[in-house]
């Protein structure tokens, strides 16, 4: 466990270096393999949160899934986002991914309060998801030759989540984890479908 924590600290250090950018530099290429690696790490942490929630509360996948009682508007990829195999549009889809990952920052603040003492690296995900958003933002800027700006999100969401009472708060944790797991899994599929090298036409 000690070596894994050390590896995590080193990785976080590299993310902090990239996260201190004021003006986003031009990336030489879209490092989708690195993004997929980070997403797989995120999915692992989400799975560990599910396990911890199941152990502590009995709210488990396939046994008790309370998501239906919540109506929070969380990041989701829909048919209109052009991320499917049919009608795929790289620019539209990447914008959706960037929007979602920037919104994940608030959700991981909530998850850190719920799992920060029992799940390793959940506190790191807040920075990781912001880094994912930055990386996709750079690619969007190259594709569109404009500056992508994240949309304004519901600033009261974190307060509402943290203000929930005991069991309802656990149910909310399950719902948030489910939405994030689905979004991150779809993002991996989307990134795998994008060519490894951005066409030279973007640089002309």
Swiss-Prot record:
<comment type="similarity">
    <text>Belongs to the IL-6 superfamily.</text>
</comment>
<dbReference type="InterPro" id="IPR003574">
    <property type="entry name" value="IL-6-like"/>
</dbReference>
<keyword id="KW-0732">Signal</keyword>
<dbReference type="InterPro" id="IPR009079">
    <property type="entry name" value="4_helix_cytokine-like_core"/>
</dbReference>
<keyword id="KW-0899">Viral immunoevasion</keyword>
<keyword id="KW-0945">Host-virus interaction</keyword>
<comment type="function">
    <text>Initiates signal transduction through binding to interleukin-6 receptor subunit beta IL6ST, independently of the cognate IL6 receptor IL6R. In infected primary effusion lymphoma cells, promotes proliferation of cells, protects them from apoptosis, and promotes immune evasion of interferon activity. Also drives blood to lymphatic endothelial cell differentiation.</text>
</comment>
<dbReference type="GO" id="GO:0006955">
    <property type="term" value="P:immune response"/>
</dbReference>
<feature type="signal peptide">
    <location>
        <begin position="1"/>
        <end position="22"/>
    </location>
</feature>
<dbReference type="GO" id="GO:0005125">
    <property type="term" value="F:cytokine activity"/>
</dbReference>
<comment type="subunit">
    <text>Interacts with host IL6ST.</text>
</comment>
<dbReference type="GO" id="GO:0005615">
    <property type="term" value="C:extracellular space"/>
</dbReference>
<dbReference type="InterPro" id="IPR030474">
    <property type="entry name" value="IL-6/GCSF/MGF"/>
</dbReference>
<dbReference type="GO" id="GO:0005138">
    <property type="term" value="F:interleukin-6 receptor binding"/>
</dbReference>
<keyword id="KW-1125">Evasion of host immunity by viral interleukin-like protein</keyword>
<dbReference type="Pfam" id="PF00489">
    <property type="entry name" value="IL6"/>
</dbReference>
<protein>
    <recommendedName>
        <fullName>Viral interleukin-6 homolog</fullName>
    </recommendedName>
</protein>
């Amino acid at each position: 466990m000690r070596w894994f924590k050390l590896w995590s600290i080193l990785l976080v250090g590299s993310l902090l270096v990239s996260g201190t950018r004021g003006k986003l530099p031009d990336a030489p290429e879209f490092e989708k393999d690195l993004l997929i690696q980070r997403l797989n790490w995120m999915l692992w942490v989400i799975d560990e949160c599910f396990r911890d929630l199941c152990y502590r509360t009995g709210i488990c996948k396939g046994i008790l899934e309370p998501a239906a009682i919540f109506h929070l508007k969380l990041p989701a990829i829909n048919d209109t986002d052009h991320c499917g195999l049919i009608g795929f549009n790289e620019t539209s889809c990447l914008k959706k991914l960037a929007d979602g990952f920037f919104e994940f920052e608030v959700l991981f603040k909530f998850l850190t309060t719920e799992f920060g003492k029992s799940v390793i690296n959940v506190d790191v995900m807040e920075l990781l998801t912001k880094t994912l958003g930055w990386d996709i933002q750079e690619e969007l800027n190259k594709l569109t030759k404009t500056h992508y700006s994240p949309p304004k999100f519901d600033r009261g969401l974190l307060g509402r989540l943290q203000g929930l009472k005991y069991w309802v708060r656990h149910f909310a944790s399950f719902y948030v984890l489910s939405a994030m797991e689905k979004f991150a899994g779809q993002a991996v599929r989307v990134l795998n479908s994008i060519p490894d090298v951005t066409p030279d036409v973007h640089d002309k």
